[in-house]
Amino acid sequence: MEPILINAQVQMWSAKAGMSKSRNALIETCVGKREVKLILYFSTGKIKTLQLHDNIKSVVLQTYGEDQNYLHLTFKNNDFLFVEKLTTTDARRLKRFLDKTSQGSIRPARSDERCGEPSTSAQELNGSGSSCETNSECFESPKESEMCMFRELSLLPSSSTFLHNVGLLENQFIKRKRFFSDLAKNEKQSNLKDSIRDFEANLVVCISNEKGKERNVREVDISKPGFGFPFETNYPEDSGVDVRDLNDLITKLFSPVLLETHCIENGLEWHEYMKTYLLYPEKLWQGLPNVGNTCYINVVLQSLCSIPLFINDLFNQGFPWIKAPKDDFNMLLMQLLVLKDIYNARFRQKLLIGITKALPIFGEIFAVDRQNDAHEFLSLCLVQLKETFQRVTMMWQSENDSGDFYLLKDIFADYATINKMPVCPVTNNFEFELLSSIFCKACGLTLFKGEPSRYLSINIPQGGKDMSIQSTLDLFFSAEELEHRCEKCLYNKSVSFHRFGRLPRVIIVHLKRYHFNESWVMKKDERPILVSKYLRLSCHCSKSTKPPPPLRPGEHVKNLDLLKPLEVLGSEILKLPFNSVRTSRSKGFETINITSNRESEAQSGKRVSEVLSGKVQQENSGKGDTAHIVGSELTKETEKLKKHEEEHRPSDLDSGSIREAQKYQQAEKCNEGRSDKQISLEALTQSRPKPISQEQTENLGKTTLSHTQDSSQSSQSSSDSSKSSRCSDDLDKKAKPTRKVDPTKLNKKEDNVYRLVNIINHIGNSPNGGHYINDAFDFKRQSWFTYSDLHVTRTQEDFVYRGRSSTGYVFFYMHNDIFEELLAKETQSTSTSKG
């Protein structure tokens, strides 16, 4: 039978070596006297041989474009070969040959005498005399002797043996060169001779010495074979993700869960693991390993993962496996954010190492093995994610049929989520507009400036007592006198204040816990700041302030329907029982169609695959929108603040909470010389509050209002002018309590209230050392958890508010209406699945 010669991209997976890198190869079919084989000739000179007779489990051929096909060949030991970029003619020829071999229509001439059992493992070509004698039965003819794979070894042979074996190899390849010369007429094989020359220039000869040990004559290439985890940047030629290579893309994202069963926690297979992940989320309390001073990275990732709307916005729009970033940092970052609960600790460690290696490109401040600031890393992540989203989305929308995303766009053409108007996850959840106004005290000329922001950085007032997050925020928005020369009257004193032009879903408050002493040495500010459960922003908004984007249908869940095309890309991969011992445990969950069986009963329709188009409102507020408001806002500011404070007068809880927080501070204080490990353990084992009564437990879902402002602090924003003096007088008056309001009750009619969902804490008394941990509210389990690298512990909600007064550094507050709606949807989803 005439051999078939095909040029294509090939990729192999085996249980021992994992997934190889996708490489260009010449594929030859060979029917010998004893075996039917596929021979793969790589451009590097390597040769691999794959035995086919009585060794084929399945053959799948798929078409994904005009004259573009891929073939998935699975062997009986569950190794597989993935061949892509096949023309229609070549694909049909190869498929026909493999089908006939599988059905027994094509058999070796003497199949009963073939040596060895069917296997996909590659054989080596031994050139020494003793080796040839040993393997003479296998290599009877020059043609069969060429069916081998060269393995790279570390030792060198003697010169005499080297010459003997090189001569042997030259004789063996004479016929092959003659055979290849007949292919010159085929334009698709124009580079064949170059490949042969490359092969002969990089021969690897394996010999046996007197002790039977194999030695290497010359390595094929310097680099290691293309096996291992695909996320590691082992290949300099890979400047980014080539999304046209579908299997490579799957490998880059899902190989740890699709292909390597030992990467799954508790030995579960992919289907079982996804079933557990969907139905029993309480089993997935996963932390992140510390790979060397990376606690600041871990707390930021855990904090972002605690905002389900943000993660779902990434996932449901196909980031990163459909719309893949082109750089390592954003690719790895998105993988950890979206698939953190699927990857096990070992693989999360590899991703974190990749992130740390990619960080130095953003500046020396993020050098490897260096302690860094969590807030700076959070800011970097938000900026990079937004820029990457905009860049990839623009490429997705603008590329034509020849672009990198053409194939993926065709596959996901029926998925409305992917093709709807894009919504940036950062803009949609964290970004807000801050309107700054500068009012001239002489002529009244007002300047307006609106700028988007993703967080508020707030100073801790000097000399303040019984301060809270709410009071420091109010002070930030209070009127402030500054020196600013008026363009109209040239007067150099003005009053400035801020207002929200657009509110976010989640507002991030960064508390500046550092100050400079007399020697200009930066010190950590450990003064207790009471953690407010609720933030009230109504007094800092105007009538034109835009509300945060509302929840869209299905936004509260990950749209797992987007995983269905993986079946099209490699359905056989998902069905393979890679470990026969575990096969029995995967019954009833054979494919990645998550919406089958039990989930269909669990109201699978709630996983809506179509997300309504709702482009984030752009900041188009101009002078016409704010000019008529700011003038009156300046004169009414103090009256509004006074009225607001009188309605929400703090009770005796404030002073008591501060005293109690000071006790917690003594328990969690750390010496600067202690190690991160000691600090981490102390942070998790420090004393918890005593059990609280049922009545108090019910009140935890309501407000613990903390709303104070000292007269000396408010007077800092005043001046000798009459206007600012009146502001100070009014601000002083609000510090005098007039009536008590139950801090555990929230006014249902109150607008623009935000609720705490996450805190990043810094443990230690120096800004240049210590350890980061974070407390996060889990919507699925409806409980608070403390994350310290890999350690995850459940904590009491009351402790979060009272015990983090001196360690709280970055605070995440979610709009209360969105919080309640999201919580209700999660509760309904949980009860439905249990029912």
Curated annotation (Swiss-Prot):
GO terms, molecular function: cysteine-type deubiquitinase activity; K48-linked deubiquitinase activity
Region (Disordered) residue spans: 102-128, 597-747
Name of one Pfam family that matches: UCH
Family annotation (PROSITE patterns): USP_1, USP_2, USP_3
GO annotation terms (biological process): negative regulation of proteasomal ubiquitin-dependent protein catabolic process; protein deubiquitination; proteolysis; regulation of androgen receptor signaling pathway; spermatogenesis
Localization: Nucleus; Cytoplasm, Cytoskeleton, Flagellum axoneme
InterPro entries per record: Papain-like_cys_pep_sf, Peptidase_C19, Peptidase_C19_UCH, USP37-like_PH, USP37-like_PH_sf, USP_CS, USP_dom
Cellular component terms per the entry's GO annotation: cytoplasm; cytoskeleton; motile cilium; nucleus
Keywords: Cell projection, Cilium, Cytoplasm, Cytoskeleton, Flagellum, Hydrolase, Nucleus, Protease, Thiol protease, Ubl conjugation pathway
Bias-annotated ranges (Basic and acidic residues): 634-652, 669-679, 726-747
PANTHER family, per the entry: UBIQUITIN CARBOXYL-TERMINAL HYDROLASE, UBIQUITIN CARBOXYL-TERMINAL HYDROLASE 26
Task of the protein: Deubiquitinase regulating several biological processes through the deubiquitination of components of these processes. Involved in somatic cell reprogramming through the 'Lys-48'-linked deubiquitination and stabilization of CBX4 and CBX6, two components of the polycomb-repressive complex 1 (PRC1). Also deubiquitinates and probably stabilizes the androgen receptor (AR), regulating the androgen receptor signaling pathway. May play a role in spermatogenesis.
Family as reported in the entry's similarity comment: Belongs to the peptidase C19 family.
Designated name of the protein: Ubiquitin carboxyl-terminal hydrolase 26
Organism field: Mus musculus (Mouse)
